[in-house]
C-alpha cells in the first residue's frame, strides 16, 4: 500500500507540474505524423526493440484494448547498427508474404528506425549513422511509409548520455524532415520521478519489462496521438506490471510527448 501511494504521489507531481525542460537542446522540426490512424507498421532495430517479447507486442496490446486495427512486423539484429539493415530488401515482396497480399504495393504505413545505442554519439560511427539514417528515411518514403526515428535511452551508468543521444538523433531526424520519437527522454523523466522503478536490465543497457512498456506506450501514443492513461493492459512476455506502475509509465509517456512536441495535454 505504501509503494502504491508513493507511486501515485510521484505521478501526480509530474502531471500537475508545468512544462519542464526535457534533457535535449534540440527542438523537433516535425511534431506530428502526416498519416492518420495507421494500421500497419514495421520496426527496424536491434535487441533494444526485441527484449521482453518485443516492443511491437506492447503496442499491439494497447491497440487491442483500444479496439484499433493494427499489425506490425519487427526485424532486429543483435547489436545491429542501421547500416546492418537492408531496408530495400525488407520492402520487397517475398513469397507468401501477407503484407504484400493481393498485389499490395504499400505494405506499411509507418516504419520505425532504431539505431545502435552508441552510433549517434561515437565519433567513428556518427558518419555511418547519418548516412544510413538518411538512406533508410528515403527508402521508407519511397515505399509510401512514414519514417519514425527512435531516440534511444542512455545506459543506466551513463545518464549524462541522455542529452548527447537526444541532441544527435533529433538533429538528424530534423535534417531528414522526419519525426523523432523521444523514448530516451521519457526514460530520463521516469527515472527522475521514480528511481525505484527500474528500466534497465542488470547489464545497465537493455530494457526491463517496465522499460519496454514505456517504449511501447510512447509508440502507441505517437501513432494515434492519444494518451494511454487508464489502459488496463499490463504488459507482455509473462512480465505483467503492477497497475500503479503501468499507470505511472502511461502518464510519463504522454507528458513527455506533449512537452516535446508542444501538444495540448
Q: Whereabouts are the PLM-identified features?
A:
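Positively charged n-region of N-terminal signal peptides that target proteins for export
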Residues: 1-4
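Bacterial N-terminal signal peptides
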Residues: 8-16
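Boundary at the C-terminal end of the N-terminal hydrophobic targeting segment
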Residues: 19-21
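N-terminal low-complexity, Pro/Thr/Ser-rich intrinsically disordered segments
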Residues: 23-40
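Conserved SGNH/GDSL esterase-like catalytic core that processes O-acyl groups on lipids
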Residues: 40-42, 49-127
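Short hydrophobic segments within beta-strands
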Residues: 44-45, 150
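Alpha-helical cap/lid subdomain in secreted, periplasmic
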Residues: 99-209, 221
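Conserved catalytic region of serine esterases and O-acyltransferases that act on ester linkages
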Residues: 206, 216-265
Amino acid at each position: 500500500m505504501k509503494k502504491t501511494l508513493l507511486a501515485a504521489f510521484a505521478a501526480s507531481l509530474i502531471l500537475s507540474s508545468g512544462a519542464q525542460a526535457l534533457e535535449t537542446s534540440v527542438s523537433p522540426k516535425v511534431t506530428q505524423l502526416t498519416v492518420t490512424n495507421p494500421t500497419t507498421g514495421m520496426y527496424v532495430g536491434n535487441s533494444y526493440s526485441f527484449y521482453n517479447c518485443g516492443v511491437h507486442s506492447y503496442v499491439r496490446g494497447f491497440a487491442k484494448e483500444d479496439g484499433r486495427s493494427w499489425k506490425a512486423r519487427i526485424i532486429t539484429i543483435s547489436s545491429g547498427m542501421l547500416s546492418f539493415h537492408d531496408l530495400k530488401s525488407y520492402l520487397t515482396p517475398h513469397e507468401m508474404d501477407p503484407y504484400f497480399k493481393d498485389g499490395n504495393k504499400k505494405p506499411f504505413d509507418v516504419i520505425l528506425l532504431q539505431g545502435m545505442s552508441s552510433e549517434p554519439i561515437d565519433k567513428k560511427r556518427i558518419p555511418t549513422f547519418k548516412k544510413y539514417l538518411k538512406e533508410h528515411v528515403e527508402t521508407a518514403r519511397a515505399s509510401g511509409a512514414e519514417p519514425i526515428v527512435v531516440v534511444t535511452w542512455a545506459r543506466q551508468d551513463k545518464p549524462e548520455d541522455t542529452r548527447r543521444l537526444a541532441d544527435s538523433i533529433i538533429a538528424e531526424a530534423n535534417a531528414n524532415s522526419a519525426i523523432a520519437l523521444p523514448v530516451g527522454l521519457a526514460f530520463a523523466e521516469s527515472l527522475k520521478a521514480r528511481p525505484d522503478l527500474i528500466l534497465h536490465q542488470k547489464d545497465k543497457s537493455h530494457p526491463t519489462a517496465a522499460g519496454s512498456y514505456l517504449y511501447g506506450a510512447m509508440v502507441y501514443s505517437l501513432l494515434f496521438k492519444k494518451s494511454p492513461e487508464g489502459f488496463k493492459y499490463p504488459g507482455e512476455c509473462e512480465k505483467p506490471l503492477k497497475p500503479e506502475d503501468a499507470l505511472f509509465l502511461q502518464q510519463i509517456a504522454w507528458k513527455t510527448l506533449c512537452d516535446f512536441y508542444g501538444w495540448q495535454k
